[in-house]
């Protein structure tokens, strides 16, 4: 009896996986993006419950982004749809990116459930198929292209190069950005090689093996250091990942750290594509101290990658060809130069009085101040009246009061 129940449970799980796989392979009907609504041709800022873009379009109204609708014209390739890559893909999908190209050779496992995005019923499906099915339901306006293979093999590398150079929103045009969300050195170097050869801008990301730190890095071939110039991560040497899995050893992973890294990666992507804020060339994250170091790295003139050295030479020529801009220092205009009467504006309260009336202000880093200070509690001043003892009794005092 117990064996038959176990067999039936296994059969149910197999059928659920097959059903999920069939659903992910279904071709959307005309006018239907595969989700629960029809495709929206134009983004709108109208504030109604049925508009999924109203909160995003508010960025334009508030002056953060000048043209948010432009996000639908971009195509982004994500290599690695794991703990960081899947969340990155979800965020970009919710933001309304034009097209996503997903690359991963792995399958969804129950061991992935400690991370974000994937669900237990998707176990056994390829990560790219499971991701496409979920993402299409979230936002049917986004175009998806998925590739279930390992980009590091010789036969797949050329196809990978072709898709990032011709798989843009308009076929034959390159993608606008490549995002590396892989977890091994070989795949990072493969992406680095392809992007250096094509002159393709990309962003690299990673989480440490102890799961409490991570980083993102913007790499513009020729302008900034490539992954071969200065690898930002120390990867364990002479370790075969497959043998580690066989021996029951694996790296730690926290959904919190991966979510933070995916968040700062997508934030950097949006700033880069939509041209707002400051784009970070390198941003680290240390969860133990809540520390976010930033820096930028110049390319190495002796880089081992010849295409990197070639891109550096082309970038130098490009900079040299730019017209030199003369910096004209404007003279500050003096307002009310004549002050015949020597009038000065003086505060009614001195700095010392203001300091004494305010509470203690903590030592804060540069650029941070308190919103307000709590005034010190003023002790009520009570005037003490001293009465001398006359030595008279209460009856004598009462008699004096009656005679008054």
UniProtKB/Swiss-Prot annotation:
The gene is UBA5. A motif (UFC1-binding sequence (UFC)) lies at residues 389-404. The modification Phosphoserine is found at residues 45, 358, 393. It comes from Pongo abelii (Sumatran orangutan). It comes from the Eukaryota. The keyword Kinase does not apply. The keyword Cell membrane does not apply. GO terms for molecular function: ATP binding; protein homodimerization activity; UFM1 activating enzyme activity; zinc ion binding. Keywords: ATP-binding, Cytoplasm, Endoplasmic reticulum, Golgi apparatus, Membrane, Metal-binding, Nucleotide-binding, Nucleus, Phosphoprotein, Ubl conjugation pathway, Zinc. ATP binds at residues 83, 104, 127, 150, 184. Residues 347-377 are annotated as: Linker. PANTHER family: UBIQUITIN-ACTIVATING ENZYME E1, UBIQUITIN-LIKE MODIFIER-ACTIVATING ENZYME 5. The UFC1-binding sequence (UFC) motif mediates interaction with UFC1. The linker region is required to activate the active site of UFC1: it region moves next to active site of UFC1 to reduce the amount of water molecules in the vicinity of UFC1's active site and thereby elevate the nucleophilic activity of UFC1 active site. Its main location: cytoplasm. This is Ubiquitin-like modifier-activating enzyme 5. A motif (UFM1-interacting sequence (UIS)) lies at residues 334-346. Belongs to the ubiquitin-activating E1 family. UBA5 subfamily. Zn(2+) binds at residues 226, 229, 303, 308. Disulfide bonds: none annotated. GO terms for cellular component: cytoplasm; cytosol; endoplasmic reticulum membrane; Golgi apparatus; nucleus. GO terms for biological process: erythrocyte differentiation; megakaryocyte differentiation; protein K69-linked ufmylation; protein ufmylation; regulation of intracellular estrogen receptor signaling pathway; response to endoplasmic reticulum stress; reticulophagy. InterPro entries: D-isomer_DH_CS1, ThiF/MoeB/HesA, ThiF_NAD_FAD-bd, Ubiquitin-activating_enz. E1-like enzyme which specifically catalyzes the first step in ufmylation. Activates UFM1 by first adenylating its C-terminal glycine residue with ATP, and thereafter linking this residue to the side chain of a cysteine residue in E1, yielding a UFM1-E1 thioester and free AMP. Activates UFM1 via a trans-binding mechanism, in which UFM1 interacts with distinct sites in both subunits of the UBA5 homodimer. Trans-binding also promotes stabilization of the UBA5 homodimer, and enhances ATP-binding. Transfer of UFM1 from UBA5 to the E2-like enzyme UFC1 also takes place using a trans mechanism. Homodimer; homodimerization is required for UFM1 activation. Interacts (via UIS motif) with UFM1; binds UFM1 via a trans-binding mechanism in which UFM1 interacts with distinct sites in both subunits of the UBA5 homodimer. Interacts (via C-terminus) with UFC1. Interacts (via UIS motif) with GABARAPL2 and, with lower affinity, with GABARAP and GABARAPL1. It is found in: Cytoplasm; Nucleus; Endoplasmic reticulum membrane; Golgi apparatus. The active site is at residue 250.
């Amino acid at each position: 009896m117990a064996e038959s129940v176990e067999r039936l449970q296994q059969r149910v799980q197999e059928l659920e996986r097959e059903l999920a796989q069939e659903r992910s392979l279904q071709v959307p009907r005309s006018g239907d993006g595969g989700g629960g609504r029809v495709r929206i041709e134009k983004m709108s800022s109208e504030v109604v419950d049925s508009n999924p873009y109203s909160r995003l379009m508010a960025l334009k109204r508030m002056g953060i982004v000048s043209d948010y609708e432009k996000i639908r014209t971009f195509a982004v390739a994500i290599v690695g749809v794991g703990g960081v890559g899947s969340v990155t893909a979800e965020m970009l999908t919710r933001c309304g990116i034009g097209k996503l190209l997903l690359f991963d050779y792995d399958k969804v496992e129950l061991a992935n459930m400690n991370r974000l995005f994937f669900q237990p019923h998707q176990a056994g499906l390829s990560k790219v198929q499971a991701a496409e099915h979920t993402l299409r339901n979230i936002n049917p306006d986004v175009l998806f292209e998925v590739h279930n293979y390992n980009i590091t093999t010789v036969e797949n590398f050329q196809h990978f190069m072709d898709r990032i150079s011709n798989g843009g929103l308009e076929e034959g045009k390159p993608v606008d950005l490549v995002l590396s969300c892989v977890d091994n050195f070989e795949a990072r170097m493969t992406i680095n090689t392809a992007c250096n050869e094509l002159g393709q801008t990309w962003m690299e990301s990673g989480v440490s093996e102890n799961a409490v730190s991570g980083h993102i890095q913007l790499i513009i071939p020729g302008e900034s250091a490539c992954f071969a110039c200065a690898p930002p991560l120390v990867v364990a040497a002479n370790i075969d990942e497959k043998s580690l899995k066989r021996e029951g050893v694996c790296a730690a992973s926290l959904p919190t750290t991966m979510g933070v890294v995916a968040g700062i990666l997508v934030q950097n992507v949006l700033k880069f594509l939509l041209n707002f804020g400051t784009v970070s060339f390198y941003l680290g994250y240390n969860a133990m101290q809540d520390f976010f170091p930033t820096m930028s790295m110049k390319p190495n003139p002796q880089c081992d990658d010849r295409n990197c050295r070639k891109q550096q030479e082309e970038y130098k020529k490009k900079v040299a060809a730019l017209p030199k801009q003369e910096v004209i220092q404007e003279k500050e205009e003096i307002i009310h130069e004549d002050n015949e009467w020597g009038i000065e504006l003086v505060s009614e309260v001195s700095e010392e009085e203001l300091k004494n009336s305010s509470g203690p202000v903590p030592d804060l880093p540069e650029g941070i101040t308190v919103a307000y200070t709590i005034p010190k509690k003023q002790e009520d001043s009570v005037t003490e009246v001293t009465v001398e003892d006359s030595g008279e009794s209460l009856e004598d005092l009462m008699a004096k009061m009656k005679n008054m």
